[in-house]
A protein has these predicted regions:
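Flexible coil/turn and secondary-structure edge motifs
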Residues: 2-5, 9, 13-21, 25-195
């Protein structure tokens, strides 16, 4: 009888421990725990979000507006607020590290183009890497330098801490999942690198 009780207790404790770890994972995304967050601007955010969702280790994506002049931002007024269309990416660094994410990022942007990606032009379509902790800067600098060396040119990609981020309107979230034939400046085959 005691053996059964002990076994039941261990199973419950194990379930509680797993639940507790999931809560920590959700609660502490930016504090060196199981999950880290980076914000990437790469032109129209619909395609950038769909591109990053495919990778193992990417736990969550969301589109929004970042690094503008004020805290308020919406799709219609981006040209006034100075925000960039940005994708928030939460990832497990034990599965995919920041350097790998940035290597993928540079596969889908033109890093020399100022305020333009594909046919989309305007300050809201600029490229940017917006970090959440100083620990990320070393990895960012390493990848940026590598790309600059390969291109023999200074990049037009902003590298700054994240500020004034606002989640985009619901109709923009997972847009290309809801509208598979919707517009995207990223080639369709780029959405299947993990297949």
């Amino acid at each position: 009888m005691y053996k059964h009780i002990k076994h039941t207790f261990q199973l419950r404790f194990f379930k509680i421990e797993i639940l507790h770890k999931k809560q920590i994972l959700k609660r502490r995304p930016n504090h060196g725990g199981f999950m880290e967050t980076i914000y990437l601007a790469g032109g129209c955010f619909w395609g950038v979000e769909k591109f990053f969702k495919q990778f193992r280790g990417v736990l969550f994506t969301e589109v929004g507006y970042a690094n503008g002049d004020g805290k308020e931002a919406n799709y219609e007024d981006l040209w006034k607020s100075g925000h960039a269309e940005t994708v928030k990416i939460e990832y497990d660094p034990s599965i995919i590290d920041l350097e790998k994410l940035l290597e993928y990022y540079f596969m889908i942007i033109d890093p020399l183009s100022v305020n333009k990606q594909g046919p989309d032009a305007g300050r809201q379509y600029r490229t940017g890497i917006y970090y959440t902790s100083n620990d990320q800067v070393k990895s960012i600098d390493k990848v940026v330098k590598k790309v600059e060396d390969e291109l023999a040119s200074k990049l037009a990609v902003e590298v700054e801490p994240i500020r004034n981020y606002k989640r985009a309107e619901e109709y923009h979230q997972k847009y290309l999942d809801k509208h598979p034939t919707g517009y995207c400046h990223i080639r369709n085959n780029m959405f299947h690198l993990e297949d």
